[in-house]
Curated annotation (Swiss-Prot):
Its cofactor is NH4(+); K(+). It is found in: Cytoplasm. Catalyzes the phosphorylation of pantothenate (Pan), the first step in CoA biosynthesis. GO terms for molecular function: ATP binding; metal ion binding; pantothenate kinase activity. K(+) binds at residue 134. CDD domains: ASKHA_NBD_PanK-III. Its main location: cytoplasm. GO terms for biological process: coenzyme A biosynthetic process. Its EC number is 2.7.1.33. This is Type III pantothenate kinase. Pathway: Cofactor biosynthesis; coenzyme A biosynthesis; CoA from (R)-pantothenate: step 1/5. Belongs to the type III pantothenate kinase family.
């Protein structure tokens, strides 16, 4: 019987779901972070996700999550317990993240940022410093030096920036980030102007901040892009050494396997 792990990146907007084996993440899905649903409705949807990936609910041997939405955690615990007969393991509450946390108030750091930083260090141990750039609800730059999480930078996310712009602008076209060109085009429509402005604007912001971070972090430094918009931004930027949209899910998988805890 196959053995797989069910991994959850519980964010403010979406829950990213990963199905992984001992070698890596084999499938990923996205559901909305709906705190008004029941544990049963969530559990049934998760069971369908597992079946869609070609597995049975009984194949799930562990459920592991990072969460920045505390009100969602009881729903996920109920769903995992009832539909997979597994307790939900939360990082860092149930599984410690083996990085020295140098934040002034360590409890303020989101679990997602710590897990992504941990994953970056485990996957690329060679560089002295590594920066994980996560394009999520916010765009975060998380800095690891040696085995220490130093902190980072937080900027607006692509969706949140687009939402703020739409809130103050009438008849704003939808931003798709569908840009095929390698250089920005002088837009001759509002849609093109927005898409090129966002893609190349966020790419330039990333390049500028990473250049400045390289002056304060110990060399050599590498940069990894992750999150939903990582591929779109990385296509037009040469500042990334690695692109791993599922970095956080991979971090949860490695964290669980290293912990020795049984689900």
């Amino acid at each position: 019987m196959p053995s797989v792990f069910l991994l959850f990146d519980i964010g403010n907007t979406n829950v990213k779901i990963g199905i992984a084996d001992h070698d890596g993440v084999v499938a990923s899905y996205v559901l909305p972070t709906d705190t008004h649903q029941t544990g049963d409705s969530l559990g049934l949807r998760l069971a369908d996700v597992v079946r869609h990936a070609g597995f049975a609910p009984g194949d799930v041997t562990a459920c592991v999550a990072s969460s920045v939405v505390p009100s969602f955690n009881p729903l996920m615990r109920q769903a995992c317990g009832r539909y997979f007969d597994r307790r939900l393991l939360l990082a860092p509450e149930d599984i410690a993240i083996p990085l020295e946390n140098r934040y002034e108030r360590p409890q303020e750091v989101g679990a997602d940022r710590l897990v992504a930083a941990f994953a970056a260090r485990r996957l690329w141990p060679a560089p002295r410093s590594i920066v994980s750039v996560d394009y999520g609800t916010a765009t975060t730059f998380d800095c690891v030096q040696g085995e220490a999480y130093l902190g980072g930078l937080i900027c607006p996310g692509v969706h949140s920036a687009a939402g703020a712009l739409a809130a103050g602008t009438a008849r704003l076209p939808r931003i798709s980030l569908d840009v095929r060109e390698d250089l920005p085009v002088v837009g001759r429509s509002t849609s093109m102007s927005l898409n090129h402005g966002f893609v190349f604007g966020f790419a330039s912001m990333t390049e500028g901040l990473c250049h400045r971070l390289s002056a304060v972090l110990e060399a050599p430094m590498q940069v990894v892009a992750t999150g939903g918009f990582a591929s779109a931004i990385a296509r037009v930027s040469n500042c990334f050494d690695h692109v791993r949209p599922d970095l956080l899910l991979e971090g949860l998988r490695i964290l669980y396997m290293e912990s020795g805890i049984k689900g």
